[in-house]
Amino acid sequence: AVVRLKGEEVVCHVKNTGRCRELLVPGAPVFLEKSDNPNRKTQYDLIAVQKGNRLINMDSQIPNKVVEEWLLQGNLFGKDARVKREVSYGNSRFDLYIETEERKIFMEVKGVTLEENGVVRFPDAPTQRGVKHIKELCKCTKDGYEAYIMFVIQMEDVLYFEPNYATHPEFGNALSEAEKAGVHILAYTCQVRKDLINLAKPVRVYVNGKEESEEEQETVC
């Protein structure tokens, strides 16, 4: 991304693999982090962007760290839970592995930055890797593990989360099948400030899309 810094245009590395087209627009205020590596092609990393009243984290490495810290504080699985990063299962390596006296859990973490009118969606670009992870999580439930997908919404004050069927229907379909297979699907907002980021509040998840879910409810009634 090209950023105007102190009157000069500077090329910055964006620490996010998504498209981020709705965020990185001309004139958007951004936050940079200076690299201490003199051999890098770019001197700065673009780590956050302001969109309206929301400050949105752009560093794709942060969600895993935020969730790990949150779990180690005793959230979700208790204070005795042991948490490991990057543990392999089958043909995949999951972001987190959690173990308690009675439970063994794999968790995949996805950072969410795509927001429109308060609705947040994932992914913002097709992700076959994401589909593969979901299918592997379904397999591990058959071997006695618990499985979780945590969507970390890297902003505050949103309405609900749903898969981005318009961009990657296969991902949405895989997520829907995962829920049926017993995979737990969670979404949490983040409190994002200049000097911190924390998990904040749980958000309603519509794995089949909100409109589809409402139509199903009407049919049942």
Regions found by a protein language model. Name each.
Residues 37-54, 200:
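OB-fold/S1-family single-stranded nucleic acid-binding modules
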Residues 118-128, 138-167, 189:
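Nucleic-acid nuclease catalytic cores
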Residues 17-31, 138:
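Short nucleic-acid-contacting surface segments enriched for D/E, G, S/T with interspersed K/R
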Residues 25-37, 189-190:
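Flexible glycine-rich surface loops and low-complexity tracts that mediate binding to linear polymers
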Residues 155-221:
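Domain-level recognition of nuclease-like catalytic cores that cleave nucleotide substrates
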Residues 1-2:
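Short aromatic-glycine-enriched beta-strand elements
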Residues 72-89:
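A short acidic/basic microdomain associated with nuclease active sites
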Residues 94-124, 137:
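Conserved catalytic cores of phosphodiester-cleaving nucleases, focusing on short active-site segments
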